[in-house]
Amino acid sequence: MKNKIAINQVRSFLLSIWAFFLHLLSRFKEDQVNIKAGHLAYVTLLSLVPIVAVMFSMLSAFPVFSGIREKLEGFVYDNFLPAAGDTVQIYINEFVANASKGTSVGIVALMVVALMLISAIDKALNSIWRTKEKRQAAVSFSMYWMVLTLGPVLVGASLVATSYIVSLKLFSETELSGVVPILIERLPMLFSVAAFLLLYMVVPIKKVKFLHALLGALVAAMLFELGKKGFAFYVTQFPSYEAIYGALATIPILFVWVYVSWVIVLVGAEITAGLPEYLHECKLIRETALAESQAETKTEEPVTESKNDGPNSSNDSGQDNVRGSEKTDEPAQDKQDKLD
């Protein structure tokens, strides 16, 4: 009996996952995730150099981050660009060096382009959440500016804190020394989860529950790690881009990876936004089913009462007939007595 209950529970759980998957597919088609990802990839490539230039300029403004730029570059290019990271790093560093030599007007233009990317991300995510409200221009600008300026500082501070904690004697001279390499290997995954979680909770205008955002962030981070390994394997084992484009193969490789990355980000957003809708639909289905069952039981009760009253009524009528016959027999008996 217990085994049957466990099997039914597992079956219902798998069916609910399948139903949620179908719900996500309908949302993907309705929101046109592939088109949104292509738009964001295009804007990202246009604003990649400005954002990197702003990041490094913000880090250089704080002396504590003076020796962390190379570590930050290596961390970003090694963990977020699965293939051709060295070539992309060389090109981007050259572009950033050229951009930093520009005039004040050019620097302002770079800032505007970087803000355009953040604005595009904001609009894409809020469209997934079906948000009709809009933020005020001052609020949007302040939020975009905070992300653009404080984001690099927070990333640099986290890397500095991580390197400091790892260098402590507590981790090097105790049994925890074997845990340190495992934690360092898991750092990209942890950073991805934290970044996705912050993105899914802060950017949407609607209120997002923490558990829903955490589920979307975990799925997006796992897909991101799998995507990095799969894309790196494809590029290294099937070098079709290098055979076709030659020295320019880095450009389409970078564009395809940025597109895949944005698809993963939007998939996590769809999961986070679609989960409360699916749970609400399931709740409505249960409530309607319960109401229908209660209505059926109410309609069946009078029918059963009438059925139960049938034999009693027949017995009562039979008794009445007997009583009537007895009453009719009484005058006949009186007449017979008089004749006697």
UniProtKB/Swiss-Prot annotation:
Protein name (database record): UPF0761 membrane protein Spea_3909
GO cellular component: a single term: plasma membrane
Organism: Shewanella pealeana (strain ATCC 700345 / ANG-SQ1)
Keywords linked to the UniProt accession: Cell inner membrane, Cell membrane, Membrane, Transmembrane, Transmembrane helix
Protein's membrane topology: Multi-pass membrane protein
Chain segments carrying region Disordered: 292-340
Chain intervals with Basic and acidic residues compositional bias: 295-308, 323-340
Family label: Belongs to the UPF0761 family.
Compartment list: Cell inner membrane
Residue spans of biased composition, Polar residues class: 309-322
TM helices/strands, residue ranges: 5-25, 45-65, 102-122, 141-161, 179-199, 213-233, 247-267
Domain of life: Bacteria
